[in-house]
From Swiss-Prot:
GO cellular component: cytoplasm
Record carries keyword Transport: no
Name of the protein in question: Cytochrome P450 119
Binding note for cofactor: Binds 1 heme group per subunit.
Temperature dependence as stated in the record: Optimum temperature is about 75 degrees Celsius. Activity is 10-fold greater at 75 degrees Celsius than that measured at 25 degrees Celsius. Thermostable up to 85 degrees Celsius. Thermal denaturation midpoint (Tm) is 91 degrees Celsius.
Name of encoding gene: cyp119
Naturally occurring in which organism (per UniProt): Sulfolobus acidocaldarius (strain ATCC 33909 / DSM 639 / JCM 8929 / NBRC 15157 / NCIMB 11770)
Compartmental location: Cytoplasm
PROSITE patterns reported for this sequence: CYTOCHROME_P450
Annotated family: Belongs to the cytochrome P450 family.
Entry EC number(s): 1.14.-.-, 1.11.1.7
């Protein structure tokens, strides 16, 4: 795929494939992400659907349609402001000890002879942390993972659609049951002027949005640092922060995203009509040689590193500071405990949007 990205950046950085516009270069990807006045994140007719729901024209809808990810200003700004402070440096500082202790406990459960570190570390860590932030029972983490996969992948054969619908209703019911027993941020949402479905969507987004991406960031970092034999250098030169940023660039947890044009738009040499869908390839933009010297090469101390893996503009990922903190602590503690990592088996996430591993089986030797 990356060979195709490289070819398209040179030949057709903005390309129409007969169905959807595709963007490959850093310059135009960033332009689409930043220009919310021309490129909308509302891909589902958010406002129209919400109005129909309130008027009773729609009896049931999926709450995750109604979030800051799928809205434009001014509603987007209102939604984002309600939880911005929980990801502030001051708030995250209070979580560092909890994250480190949780990471050490999870590492204790790993069998160094052979074990799956996606299952034992990369999956549970972000779920446990967001559960604490929201005041939800940590013992329900297995349910959170199942629901997270459901919302992230939205996969299913025709015969499985009914079962998927039942699981989605379970998720909605769970969030409803805990709306009045959460922490300050949950109370803030409950007491806001949002509609009931917006409140549900908001809490569901906070609960699961960062799980898959943080899991992918941790597992991708382990893969990249092992593949390029970088663990010793990262330890000795204390390159954890820069190396994780490079893993974000080189192996982004999210490969692409989509916007919809609000008006006729000129992008590069192409003219895109109003109402067209535009797919921007973050994974391609992150290796654009016009921005990243030796973009196809993994450089653990790369600086500067203006990758787009957490987005750009008003939709820059709200939870990015938390994801970075979790990944840094996970990699630090993992690296301190194990000096040799042998990858035995892997299984990729079956999804062209998310980039990560369902399984990452390793053999480890401790530093003792």
């Amino acid at each position: 795929m990356y060979d195709w990205f490289s070819e398209m950046r040179k030949k057709d950085p903005v390309y129409y494939d007969g169905n959807i516009w595709q963007v490959f270069s850093y310059r135009y990807t960033k332009e689409v992400l930043n220009n919310f006045s021309k490129f909308s994140s509302d891909l589902t007719g958010y406002h129209e659907r919400l109005e129909d729901l309130r008027n009773g024209k729609i009896r049931f809808d999926i709450p995750t349609r109604y979030t800051m990810l799928t809205s434009d200003p001014p509603l987007h700004d209102e939604l984002r402001s309600m939880s911005a402070d929980i990801f502030s440096p001051q708030k995250l500082q209070t979580l560092e000890t909890f994250i480190r202790e949780t990471t050490r406990s999870l590492l204790d459960s790993i069998d160094p002879r052979e074990d799956d570190i996606v299952k034992k570390l990369a999956v549970p860590l972000p779920i446990i942390v967001i559960s604490k932030i929201l005041g939800l029972p940590i013992e329900d983490k297995e349910k959170f993972k199942e629901w997270s996969d459901l919302v992230a992948f939205r996969l299913g054969k025709p015969g499985e659609i009914f079962e998927l619908g039942k699981k989605y209703l379970e998720l909605i019911g769970y969030v409803k049951d805990h709306l009045n027993s959460g922490t300050e941020v949950v109370s803030r949402v409950v007491n806001s002027n949002l509609s009931d479905i917006e409140k549900l969507g908001y809490i569901i987004l906070l609960l699961i949005a960062g799980n898959e991406t943080t899991t992918n960031l941790i597992s991708n970092s382990v893969i990249d640092f092992t593949r390029f034999n970088l663990w010793q250098r990262i330890r000795e030169e204390n390159l954890y922060l820069k190396a994780i940023e490079e893993a974000l660039r080189y192996s982004p947890p999210v490969m692409r995203t989509v916007r919809k044009t609000k008006e006729r738009v000129k992008l590069g040499d192409q003219t895109i009509e109003e109402g067209e869908y535009v797919r921007v390839w973050i994974a391609s933009a992150n290796r654009d040689e016009e921005v990243f010297h030796d973009g196809e090469k993994f450089i653990p101390d790369r600086n500067p590193n203006p990758h787009l893996s957490f987005g750009s503009g008003i939709h820059l990922c709200l939870g990015a500071p938390l994801a970075r903190l979790e990944a840094r602590i996970a990699i630090e503690e993992f690296s301190k405990r194990f000096r040799h990592i042998e990858i035995l088996d892997t299984e990729k996430v079956p999804n062209e949007v998310l980039n990560g591993y369902k399984r990452l089986v390793v053999r480890l030797k401790s530093n003792e």
